[in-house]
């Protein structure tokens, strides 16, 4: 019988809550085996006796209450709540090892605990986030950020841009590529054979027939019409204020929002801290928590693992859907 896929869980910033969140994975039995990538002694210390921490062996069976750790050594000792640029290389080494394992077939997916972008940049490494790093290191020219939680799937046409820059970034080429990636991953990794995507407009009231902006008429609608002609089930452009009501949301499988704060506040309100960040378009599956390093909680034992658990659950479902689709 073939062994089940392994999920690589990167433990993230060592001064943050990532290591202790990862230690809590031993509290549950998982359909696929989670393996934590991190410094062995760091993870064991943050587990604080709540789990049996053992060295990762590829062929060892999963065991209740046991946490498998693939040892990646810290550069310098880590203290809860105290960032040290000397460990930036360690954080990136976790990601590199996880990507290598996914590309080689050792791992079925990556689940990432939070990193601290600022301290990585302080170390002299230009780093804008997991998403961009993974795209670069897998040779992926375009990826799409989607948040999942509270019964919603919300993808973004643009991500971390100033609001003033968003209209110029919403081009036919960007929307075409974004919708193709979203559609492909909903079908191949979410098990939705013919996904229905609700597309938000950019302007209030979706432009009010051109009286409040013409992006809907000149850019968004023509792209949707062309892709409908290829068989995609697309609804929109819809006014965002009425799109995010239960009746409308119930008519679609996912939402494409035009910018970060158009879509994510609704999802984060609905998910109650259990949201999951998914990177679409990669050749590998990657999910992540939807929160930061929470340095003030590190080492206190009070960090909530809900988002990490949800990220592991979603990665598991995506692996299973992908394998069925193959």
From Swiss-Prot:
It comes from the Bacteria. A divalent metal cation binds at residues 160, 205, 260. Keywords: Cobalt, Cytoplasm, Magnesium, Metal-binding, NAD, NADP, Oxidoreductase, Pyridoxine biosynthesis, Zinc. GO terms for molecular function: 4-hydroxythreonine-4-phosphate dehydrogenase activity; cobalt ion binding; magnesium ion binding; NAD binding; zinc ion binding. One of its GO terms (biological process) is pyridoxal phosphate biosynthetic process. Belongs to the PdxA family. The active site is located at the dimer interface. Catalyzes the NAD(P)-dependent oxidation of 4-(phosphooxy)-L-threonine (HTP) into 2-amino-3-oxo-4-(phosphooxy)butyric acid which spontaneously decarboxylates to form 3-amino-2-oxopropyl phosphate (AHAP). This is 4-hydroxythreonine-4-phosphate dehydrogenase.
